[in-house]
Each structure stands twice: as structure tokens, then as C-alpha cells.
Amino acid sequence: SQHEIEDILTIGKEMIEKPIELLDGVEEVLQKLKKNYTLIVATKGDLLDQERKLEKSGLLQYFHHIEVMSEKKEADYQKLIRHLDIQPRELLMVGNSLKSDILPVLKIGASAIHVPFHTTWAHEEVSKKDAHESTFKTVHSITDILRFL
């Protein structure tokens, strides 16, 4: 109905206008890393929406490249590495999802640091066995990654 369509449009508009909330220390970490590393965003989702979020966050200036993927599986990361013309050992992924940020990257020979977030989508959860068979660092705050670099 017309009323339902209006409700959907209102919800969509509210989502777009919702302010971006940065985790503590994110900008400080990006400032430090940008001095010595090429920073890339690798994310899933809609290209325009992800670019808008980065622009709105004020963090776009720190990134050399934005890669918006339909999936984040081994093949997608291999494609990214080819596109960037780098070797897997030159890639360090920092992410909050074991399933899509950490494990596929490790399987292609890259490194990873897991920064758990207090909420994880159900489809992003992995078995303890899968997580423990892999070698990656886990930190509790984004600022902790600076200790490893």
C-alpha cells in the first residue's frame, strides 16, 4: 500500500541520515598507519552507500583505495591482491569478522588481526575449531594493533 511504501522510504532516509559513530582511536590509528602503509578499505555492501559512509565519517582521506565486494571469500581477496599488484604476505587485514575478514585472508597467505566487536551478525559466526586452527592476533581495541606494526 501507499502507506507501507512511505514507511519504507522514511526508514531508509533515517538510516542514510544516521550519524556515523567511530570507534575510539580509529582516526588516531589511521593517521599513524598512513605514514608508513598503503591503507585499503575492503568491505561488503553497496558501493555508493559504503563511499557515502566513508565520506561522512571523515576517514576517506586516509585510504588509497576502496574495494567493495559482493562477497569476502578467498577468491575475492585473491582478486584484490591481483588488482593491487601485491603479494599475499604484503597484506595485513584488520577486521571484526572471523568468517569474512580473518579466515579467508589467512587461507591465501596474508596476515590478519581480529578486533572483535560487541555484536556479530549470526551469519558471520564461525566454529571454535575453525578459529583455533588459524593463527592470527586478537586485540581488544583498534589502538592495540599499533603494538604489532
Residue ranges: model-predicted function:
Residues 1-14:
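A metal-dependent, Asp-based hydrolase signature
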Residues 10, 41, 47-50:
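Short alpha-helical segments used as structural interaction elements across diverse proteins
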Residues 12, 42, 110-112:
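Small side chains
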Residues 13-41, 74:
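Short, acidic loop-to-helix structural element flanking the phosphoryl-transfer center
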Residues 31, 46-149:
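Asp-based, Mg2+/Mn2+-dependent phosphohydrolase catalytic module
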